[in-house]
Amino acid sequence: MRQLETEVIAVQEVDYKLPRSDMRNQVLDIATAIGAKDWAFAPSIVGTPGEKWRKLTSADLRIVTSVSDVLDGSYGIAIASTIPVIKWHRLELGNSVVGMPLVVPTESETSSKPKIRAIYVHDEPRLALGATLANGWTVINTHLSFVPGVNLFQLKKLKRWALKIAIETNTKPLILGDLNLPKNLPIAASDWKSLIKQNTYPSWGAKIQFDYLLTHGAFADQVKDLGTIATGISDHLPLRAEIN
């Protein structure tokens, strides 16, 4: 993580105190690695995906931070920031009622490249986590559904929400994350702009862009693409940008 040299990081598919990841608070580990005091984890489910899990109830925390670090083992998305966070936000995006067969990587005993296998995957609840920063930006992390059509509906809802928060907080919105949509679809027929064009999946030979930095307004000339780095900890490549 340190090699990313970032002030703000948005991550998806994060474990929070799950047995498969040695009961670690992975968000705190990430925040510590980049020197971030402010971090938040937004669970999408309680339990382990693909194994035993349940949807959140009214008794479960929707946003876990350093001052509310109490929750059962969960899985979701997170933001860590070295820039002070003024306010955290959460939006429920729902999930597809049907799953899909997906091609997923598994470790290979004979090659450095993962083996590929197809499995049927049920869609989990999706959400967005926002952080209004002290520098005039609101960054919003998400991981949209892999089901075609459902992800477009979720993104439309997310964009409306992002603009609403931007107006309320007098900040500029930035949507980050795995949108599960190929090139240009996230910005088609909209005023949103994709700040970086970079294939991100799979990490061992990226052929398609699923991950994006989206902004609303004329900020493209203030962005420097810092290039991607193969971290070895994900099947996606991270996008890195410097925004003035």
Which stretches of residues belong to each language-model region?
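Short acidic, glycine/proline-enriched helix-loop-strand junctions
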Residues: 25-28, 34-37
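Active-site regions of metal-assisted phosphoester/phosphodiester hydrolases
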Residues: 1-8, 17, 21-22, 32-33, ...
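Phosphate-group recognition and catalysis centered on beta-loop-alpha active-site segments
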Residues: 14
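Surface-exposed patches in mature extracellular/periplasmic domains of secreted proteins
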Residues: 38-44
